[in-house]
Amino acid sequence: SRGNHPRLTPKMQFANDYSMNLETFLYWSLADYFKNEKRIAFKIEQSELSYLTIYGKTNRFFHGHQVRFAGGIGGLTIPLYKAIHRWNANIKADYNFMCDKHTYSNPTPDCQCNGSLIGYNPMAVSFGFAYQKPLQSFTLLDSKRGYTIKAPIFCE
């Protein structure tokens, strides 16, 4: 899913954010470069939400700027539950992958937040995120047992 940082407009665009985002152009360029490589496929959505079914499980991918929590004591959990509930009313997802909050966590049983590849930085300080080393998330979906492993990948 696209992020909100490489947008070409001062504020988020909703109907056309895919065409106003440098990451979209990067994805299109990569898709063109690898167009003859049969082992690689790109799924470049025009929507903020992307769905991918694997082993009969529907996975939802989203950046996360859609979920706002204003630094409340409950943190991200309640607003995230509400967003997932609203989205599930349209398309039910078995699991959710979010990238925006720059902190690796599993805030709900059906959602994993990706860590920050660059690690703790001035933005993390400004938003009050807890210190974390540079990391990404890993989730294993087994064809028979479902989601079995959720773990950080340390990127130092």
Feature names for model-found ranges:
Residues N16-Q46, Y55-E156:
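Conserved beta-sheet core of the metallophosphoesterase superfamily
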Residues Y51:
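Catalytic phosphate/metal-binding cores of nucleic-acid and nucleotide-processing enzymes, i.e., regions
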Residues S1-M12, S116-G119:
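Active-site neighborhood of divalent metal-dependent phosphoester/pyrophosphate hydrolases
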